[in-house]
Amino acid sequence: MSEAMMWLLVRGVWETLAMTFVSGFFGFVIGLPVGVLLYVTRPGQIMENARLYRSLSAVVNIFRSIPFIILLVWMIPFTRIIVGTSIGLQAAIVPLTVGAAPFIARIVENALLEIPAGLIEASRAMGATPLQIVRKILLPEALPGLVNAATITLITLVGYSAMGGAVGAGGLGQIGYQYGYIGYNATVMNTVLVLLVVLVYLIQLSGDRIVRAVTHK
């Protein structure tokens, strides 16, 4: 493998990490409040609102059901409006964020559902407002689950970013497609595969350690 290809792979790793973590951050900025809203508006919860819950849940389910490669192509006009181009690192972050947000929202909702109902009832009995319950009970108690959700999301985004590489998003996916598949270079393809596996392993390892650190003893 040439030195130029090695540097290209290094840049591909950097671009993949940038796409993954930036879109993961914005995905959480959108998905976390949506997930909390899904939980608190569920039937029997502290801000029960069946109509809002059904509407929000339907939107989340619709976006979760769209395969990422279809979402990527469908969002090209919107991506051009937002960042001025439909190819490259910045352009990839837009559909990655949109793809991650509903996924995060549903995982956040499920993490909150694991909290014992008795804690919430005790807080309500002491006069806590819904906002106080969310800030002081729900989010702290669900922190291990939320960290696990972040780990799963980042791993999913690594795979999404690789798919995006096939349509010019950059990163390891584009290198594997352009030089490995189109260029019939098995060495490049295998190297990209190994690098993606290593990235996923490191993200999972880091996530597991953080979960252990924040889990209540």
Swiss-Prot record:
The lineage of its organism: Bacteria, Pseudomonadati, Pseudomonadota, Gammaproteobacteria, Enterobacterales. The keyword Oxidoreductase does not apply. Belongs to the binding-protein-dependent transport system permease family. CysTW subfamily. This is D-methionine transport system permease protein MetI. It comes from Salmonella typhi. PANTHER family: ABC TRANSPORTER PERMEASE, D-METHIONINE TRANSPORT SYSTEM PERMEASE PROTEIN METI. InterPro entries: AA_ABC_Transporter_Permease, MetI-like, MetI-like_sf. Coiled coil: none annotated. It is found in: Cell inner membrane. The keyword Nucleus does not apply.
